[in-house]
């Protein structure tokens, strides 16, 4: 499987999971996201068609999440992304300071 196919499959799975977690049917999701044809949601969730970025934003909003969470590289990152998205400016400032003060060994490889 190519990288593109893996990314498409991951996004399709996350779109379906986010919709189900939001408690929406395919038809309800289409209405919430402003999509006139609900079968497009099915195509997104099956990986047959990738949503354009503006549509991905609309879907994320309808599902109560963010495009970043839907596109996260791995599932472990999703709770962190959600917490950052919900943080206020003071919390984000504290997080930035904490990240800046991480020892080099705990930072991303190659960032030294």
Over which residues does each language-model region extend?
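DNA major-groove recognition helix of helix-turn-helix
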Residues: 44-45, 55, 71-74
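Short alpha-helical DNA-recognition segment
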Residues: 21-43
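Interfacial/linker helices and their anchor residues that mediate assembly or domain coupling
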Residues: 75-112
